[in-house]
Amino acid sequence: MEAYKQWVWRNREYVQSFGSFANGLTWLLPEKFSASEIGPEAVTAFLGIFSTINEHIIENAPTPRGHVGSSGNDPSLSYPLLIAILKDLETVVEVAAEHFYGDKKWNYIILTEAMKAVIRLALFRNSGYKMLLQGGETPNEEKDSNQSESQNRAGNSGRNLGPHGLGNQNHHNPWNLEGRAMSALSSFGQNARTTTSSTPGWSRRIQHQQAVIEPPMIKERRRTMSELLTEKGVNGALFAIGEVLYITRPLIYVLFIRKYGVRSWIPWAISLSVDTLGMGLLANSKWWGEKSKQVHFSGPEKDELRRRKLIWALYLMRDPFFTKYTRQKLESSQKKLELIPLIGFLTEKIVELLEGAQSRYTYISGS
């Protein structure tokens, strides 16, 4: 396994390009949207999992300082990998369940959605109640401004303590070149004065070099729910409820589909209502109340909110809206363009792909 990791790290650009190219080709597999063909979806899932694992290896590649990527040893960082693998497998589960069990496939889809919801809720808790990015597939490593300031103060106080504790007046900053050079000279003098130590000289030199090269890693403390509510009050509660609604919305949607059927307006309307309510709560947590109590979103979190609004377009692809409105518009556009060379052919293929994707819950679930 280590040899394979080394190969992926050395050829990361080639691996990423190949994964994107192969995943794109899977949409052109014959019988891609046939209810009885599990093979094409299995190939798609295998390539998806292969690409996901490779991306995970690349993201956790050792840095020049010897650290392992941004992931470190945080156990919560295994959750994004699990979510990505589940999303790669869910279409195979749907197709296989439909082939072998017919309408009972919804029981298996509910199971996969429940697993994703549980993992995402665990990730939401373990991340200190931060917004999930890309449904939890991208770690939210943006620090809260208050936490960053306190950690910077702790880091500065720790760096100011030299080998003689508070008596050390050589406040060298190890983050810049001059500070590293002065720290190295200080470390060299310290080594010369402690030659009688039981620790071998070569070991001491390595330890001092690591201390100079590597800035101190201050572990970020995860915020608890009680701390979120104490700090942000009602806004913190609105944010948490809004995020939980976003996480559980796909499970709620598929539960109502099993009860009322995919052609009923009830699941469609309830899903849209949950999305609207969740987004409204998140928006109110940002603007409502005192400024000190408002929830401030980072740049990636603002992008995530925009992404969530964009995927509302999937409601146009979900039944019964698709059958009653969207399909008619697609067929009308296809008829108007079918006589134009090349454009008519491309339009036909696009409509075919959209209608095929619409037939699979997992392609339009937005989960």
UniProtKB/Swiss-Prot annotation:
Q: What happens when the gene is disrupted?
A: Not viable shrunken seeds. Starch accumulation in mature embryos, cotyledon and hypocotyl cells. Developmental delay during early embryo morphogenesis.
Region listing for Disordered, in residue ranges: 135-173
Q: Is the keyword Endoplasmic reticulum assigned to this protein?
A: yes
Q: What does this protein do?
A: Involved in the formation of peroxisomes, lipid bodies and protein bodies.
**Know anything about its domains from the record?**
The internal domain (235-279) containing two internal membrane helices and the intervening residues that include the basic cluster VRS is sufficient for targeting recombinant proteins to endoplasmic reticulum and then to peroxisomes.
Tell me which Gene Ontology terms the entry assigns under biological process.
fatty acid biosynthetic process; peroxisome organization
**Annotated protein name in UniProt:** Peroxisome biogenesis protein 16
| Upper lineage | Eukaryota, Viridiplantae, Streptophyta, Embryophyta, Tracheophyta
Q: Which domain of life is it from?
A: Eukaryota
Subunit description: Interacts with APEM9 (via both N- and C-terminus).
A Pfam family assignment: Pex16
* Alphabetical list of InterPro entries matching this protein: Pex16
Record's bilayer topology term? Multi-pass membrane protein
Alphabetically ordered keywords of this record: Endoplasmic reticulum, Membrane, Peroxisome, Peroxisome biogenesis, Transmembrane, Transmembrane helix
Localization per record: Peroxisome membrane; Endoplasmic reticulum membrane
Tissues expressed in: Expressed in roots, siliques, seeds, cotyledons, leaves and flowers. Low expression in leaves and roots.
**TM spans (from-to):** 237-257, 264-284
What is the similarity comment for this entry?
Belongs to the peroxin-16 family.
Q: Chief localization class?
A: membrane
